């Protein structure tokens, strides 16, 4: 009986350690809408989620962003990003100019409370007519 209790305790400790050690890899950025219209003042939005729980991360601080056409071999075609408010928990939105149709790569980095490492992500958006 004691052995079963000890084994259960070890299993719980391992599960907790794995979650704690996941660090920045325990989070994921996802596009809210992967296809957007090309043009000026386009809003692109990403959702930051904790992988283990699936819950949105609402208190992240975005520390770096870049959007360019590197998926279409035009990495020099970049556009500035301006943060805009979002009413949805865990959603981070940006206004940008997507001057051409094609694939645009949003590179993003965020600090999440309680995580020593920076959470990074790359999300591809498709700009259409």
Predicted feature descriptions by range:
Residues 1-7:
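Bacterial N-terminal signal peptides that target proteins for export
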Residues 7-8, 22:
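General helical structural elements
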Residues 8-15:
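Bacterial N-terminal signal peptides
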Residues 15-16, 51:
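A generic, residue-level signal for flexible/boundary positions that often mark functional hotspots
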């Amino acid at each position: 009986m004691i052995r079963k209790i000890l084994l259960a305790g070890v299993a719980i400790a391992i599960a907790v350690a794995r979650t704690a050690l996941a660090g920045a890899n325990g989070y994921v950025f996802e596009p809210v809408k992967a296809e957007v219209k090309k043009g000026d003042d386009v809003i692109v939005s990403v959702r930051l989620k904790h992988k283990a729980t699936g819950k949105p991360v609402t208190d992240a601080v975005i520390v770096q962003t870049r959007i360019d056409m590197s998926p279409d071999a035009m990495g020099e075609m970049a556009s500035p990003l301006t943060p805009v408010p979002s009413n949805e928990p865990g959603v981070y939105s940006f206004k940008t100019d997507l001057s051409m149709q094609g694939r645009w790569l949003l590179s993003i980095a965020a600090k999440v409370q309680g995580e020593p490492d920076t959470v990074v992500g790359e999300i591809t958006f498709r700009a259409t007519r």
